Amino acid sequence: MQELDIAGVGSVRVTRKNDNVVVIEKDLATEQMILAMGPQHPSTHGVLKLECLTDGEVITEAEPYLGYLHRCFEKSCEHVDYPAIVPYTDRLDYLASMNSEQAYAMAVEKLLDIEIPRRVEFIRVIVAELNRIASHLVAIGTYGIDLGAFTPFLFCFRDREIILGLLEWASGARMLYNYIWIGGLAYDVPSDFFKRVGEFVTYFRPKAVELCNLLTENEIFVKRTRGIGIMPADVAINYGWSGPMLRGSGVKWDLRRNDPYSVYPELDFSVPVPDGKVSVVGDCLSRHLVRAYEMDESLKIIEQCIDKMPTAEGFNPRSAIPKRIRPKAGEVYARAENPRGELGFYIMSDGKSTKPLRCKARSSCFVNLSAMKDLSKGQLIPDLVAIIGSIDIVLGEVDR
């Protein structure tokens, strides 16, 4: 228990019960106050506004306000041909564009019922897992900054630059790649690409452990995240959570394993979930640990893809790409495991047009953010920063 003397309020006793609920005992009652956080705030990771109802330092309710970055993605897709939508998907989760491209390409390929060359599938998985690691490095580095630790950010972005260099070598772009096309790839990878990727895997494996320890062995970071923003597994499932958020609550659910696609059924990897030894299952620290552990699993996947890679002899990355895409009438839904959770595309075709009748994106960030009210209730105002950072939102995908 901590006792504070606050001017105008009197004696205040702050206690935490079961590493979860903050209990405030006051000698004098306080009035409820509405506190607006954002949309211009460094801790909201974009143009997010939170309207918080507070009782002193305790949050009783928090409501997110969205739409500041809305770009009419879904409506715009109805006015362009299927291949032209790929660059639009890059701008959803712009920190994991390869993963977004893969999910959209899978949906249209399912609608067209076309088979993809195996080499294309393996290359797709490699670039997607590289992008997953790069995305988690941003999440881990910026989370440290949110809570006052600047050094891990520098190390994370140092290693992220190597990954962006590899992806730029393959696609020609640092970000927003337009590389995974419907039915194939824009280009085959350079001849020494897999060698360079293998060297990165060898280099980064010990670095991943080092980056994890920089924060988890920091007493201040652990105090700010352990037992904060706990989400029970059943509530997380009811909200429709996915990705590291759901796994952070102890649910072993990963689309690459539970609803496998591409060549993931041929690959051996684990789905990390917290064991409750370092963190309280479902708290901010658990979600951070899941992202840190996932980077090592991505390295395992990349290594296996390189070992199983079919030869490039006679390979044409565009061999399965239709010259004109006009799917038969119907509708499909395809989903993929993105760094922030399940990204799904629902596409409807009228059978006549080269443009989709409807293209709906299912955003994991939007679903995860919708639980802010439950995550923040009973927490202190400074803990709200830790909670937002643990969600790892990208507003480009939330607003679309």
From Swiss-Prot:
Localization recorded for this chain is: Cell inner membrane
Q: What is its EC number?
A: 7.1.1.-
Q: What is its main location?
A: membrane
Q: What class of enzyme is it?
A: translocase
- Membrane-traversing stretches: none
Give the UniProt entry's GO cellular component terms. Answer: plasma membrane
- Asked whether the keyword Zinc-finger is assigned, the reply is no
The UniProt function text for this chain reads:
NDH-1 shuttles electrons from NADH, via FMN and iron-sulfur (Fe-S) centers, to quinones in the respiratory chain. The immediate electron acceptor for the enzyme in this species is believed to be a menaquinone. Couples the redox reaction to proton translocation (for every two electrons transferred, four hydrogen ions are translocated across the cytoplasmic membrane), and thus conserves the redox energy in a proton gradient.
How it assembles, according to the record, is:
NDH-1 is composed of 14 different subunits. Subunits NuoB, C, D, E, F, and G constitute the peripheral sector of the complex.
NCBIfam families in the cross-refs: PRK06075.1
- Family listed: Belongs to the complex I 49 kDa subunit family.
Question: Which protein are we looking at?
Answer: NADH-quinone oxidoreductase subunit D
Upper taxonomic lineage: Bacteria, Pseudomonadati, Chlorobiota, Chlorobiia, Chlorobiales
